[in-house]
Amino acid sequence: MRTTPMANASNIERKWLVVDAAGKTLGRLSTEVASILRGKHKPTYTPHVDTGDHVIIINAEKIELTGKKLTDKIYYRHTQHPGGLKSRTALEMRTNYPEKMLELAIKGMLPKGSLGRQMFKKLNVYRGSEHPHQAQKPEVYELRG
């Protein structure tokens, strides 16, 4: 009887990838990055094991949104105090917190639970084209499409 080889923590090789967000659409970039973080691009993908690679996103402030989403899309958060519901438009988020905007989009596409939280820790988002991970020798990743 033959068995399918299953990945486990000891036999996973992780790469560091750099993705440039300049001029890319938020949703299209987020889906592909979420897939890389999960490890679905690898033939060794195993649903119950974190097989994904580390992803560094640069130029987060240059992300694009289609249509009127910059003015119409609203991000909500709550301060946990009575009457503490706060809101920001996508334009305010992109101007002041572009890293958070990308992180929220990608986090929503990852599994909910401890495995998803572990995958999310491999995401690094930065404003501008500089990042502090040169020591890991990251490879440039070109998005499909």
UniProtKB/Swiss-Prot annotation:
Q: Which Gene3D superfamilies match?
A: Ribosomal protein L13
PROSITE patterns cross-referenced by the UniProt entry: RIBOSOMAL_L13 (PS00783)
Q: Which UniProt keywords apply?
A: Ribonucleoprotein, Ribosomal protein
Q: Which domain of life is it from?
A: Bacteria
Coiled coil region boundaries: none
Molecular functions per Gene Ontology: mRNA binding; structural constituent of ribosome
Task: Kindly indicate whether the keyword Phosphoprotein belongs to this entry.
Answer: no
Q: Which GO terms describe its cellular component?
A: cytosolic large ribosomal subunit
Which residues pair up as cystines? none
What job does this protein perform? Answer: This protein is one of the early assembly proteins of the 50S ribosomal subunit, although it is not seen to bind rRNA by itself. It is important during the early stages of 50S assembly.
Q: Which family does it belong to?
A: Belongs to the universal ribosomal protein uL13 family.
Q: HAMAP family from the entry?
A: Ribosomal_uL13 (MF_01366)
Q: How does it assemble?
A: Part of the 50S ribosomal subunit.
Record protein name field = Large ribosomal subunit protein uL13
List the source organism: Bacillus licheniformis (strain ATCC 14580 / DSM 13 / JCM 2505 / CCUG 7422 / NBRC 12200 / NCIMB 9375 / NCTC 10341 / NRRL NRS-1264 / Gibson 46)
The organism that produces this protein has a lineage beginning with: Bacteria, Bacillati, Bacillota, Bacilli, Bacillales
Q: Source gene?
A: rplM
